[in-house]
Amino acid sequence: MSVEIRIRPSLFAIEHALRASPLWQSSVPDEAAFASQEPFFIDTMTPEQWLQWVFLPRMHALLDSGAPLPARLAILPYFEVAFEGRSDDVGELLTQLRVLDALFEE
């Protein structure tokens, strides 16, 4: 089974973990937040906003269009640091991010 075929279920698992946590947001950030030029939109969005509103949709769009996927992916370290010390239950989300990163190491 190709990596691309396994990526979409991993993205859905990340979304499911995000929805099951208190981090899921029902309101889209302001349009200006999407104009960021910074990695992870760190200057305009929280990590969970970037994951929900930027990363997941862009990855699905790449898969839908058949466009090349990133050769490497390592977003888990960012989220481990960003969520350090938070009281939210993010364990399952971090687990699913770890799974996705591992798919890009194959």
Write out the residue ranges for each language-model feature:
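N-terminal intrinsically disordered, cationic/polar leader segments
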Residues: 2-33, 37-38, 76, 88-97, ...
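Hydrophobic alpha-helical packing segments in soluble, helical-rich domains
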Residues: 14-17, 44, 51, 55
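Short, highly charge-biased, low-complexity peptide segments
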Residues: 81-89
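Mid-chain, well-packed structural core segment of small domains
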Residues: 50-82
